[in-house]
């Protein structure tokens, strides 16, 4: 057989046959179901994920780090997750930490140890970590604190970061000085040199920064061997999951729409895209494989830290919501600010994410109120504005236009189906649904999995 080149070969490559007609969009493969926060975080995403994870084969995280907090209650045991996908509880499910997540390895193992004591078993057989995920170092956390102190000194205010090193790690990623899990898995001497160079860069910017590099490298060498069996090429892992046998794949978003680096109340936001685009970039999957996108919202609104909050109630109502709702941050332990449900932000979150349905949580917290208000529009100088303001100073000046509803004044915590809810609570839910133009699929009336009323 001749392996030489011929004129025929040339013709076949330079004049390929035309592709007939328009190429169809490749919609093949399993669809990925996505759960996202629709407010400022702490909406109860973990509970919705937990419900769906019972039937899922894979649950993934696509962005954020251990600055997020999910609480899941199973058989009266309360599990707290920060980096681990909450699907890790399900023994038949693989949990995947994607390339868009930033991983603090000491934090990851501390979280695993805590949840093991509560009964989590066999996690190492069902956890996969992307080799392209970036590493959060202890010195990133120290820098996070120094930056907050600097902001406070210069501007008289800070961002209210969790000081978990998330922002500095994403900044390193963008400036191309970051290190990834694949670097830790490769030559450790080369990895060590790059870590030392990064520390020197930071110390030139922050002369007071003290770092015990050798101690951190020693710990990282130990962690490297512990995670080595869990590390995979995330792109190929997700491709096989989507294009292999039929699987149910679920993605749990961290943080929320109004904390998104692009679409949130900047600069009081997180450092990643926590809207639907972050799912594609944080896992390495095509948009065509995104299926249902579920938005999660409380029946009222909360926010941790500083930043604009148009429907905030700095009064007895806000205090009652805070107390009844046990509104304390899972990650920070800070009290959450509380206010009425804001449909302007919910509609805005839907515009970005294209929610196919909503989960409305913590309806039972409103049970004791005589009247309940819902923010339906913003006004500036008495005139309605047709959009959610990007500029923070404008947002802080808006007046909120409210619709007022009579309270139902009865306990909803035992409700397990739509018909069990009082008529006034049903009216409230239908109003929210109609205003934002998205069906409400679940209504939460308590902490446990059983307290989620499924509507359809």
From Swiss-Prot:
Keyword Disulfide bond: no
Binding site for substrate: 42, 330-336
Annotated residues for binding of Mg(2+): 42, 69
SUPFAM superfamilies: P-loop containing nucleoside triphosphate hydrolases (SSF52540)
Coiled coil: none
Modified residues (Phosphoserine): 130
Residue ranges crossing the lipid bilayer per the database entry: none
Entry GO terms, CC: cytoplasm
EC annotation from Swiss-Prot or TrEMBL: 6.3.4.4
Active site annotation, chain numbering: 42, 70
Catalysed reactions listed for this entry: IMP + L-aspartate + GTP = N(6)-(1,2-dicarboxyethyl)-AMP + GDP + phosphate + 2 H(+)
UniProt family annotation: Belongs to the adenylosuccinate synthetase family.
Function: Component of the purine nucleotide cycle (PNC), which interconverts IMP and AMP to regulate the nucleotide levels in various tissues, and which contributes to glycolysis and ammoniagenesis. Catalyzes the first committed step in the biosynthesis of AMP from IMP.
Subunit architecture: Homodimer.
Name this protein carries in UniProt: Adenylosuccinate synthetase isozyme 1
Species per Swiss-Prot/TrEMBL record: Danio rerio
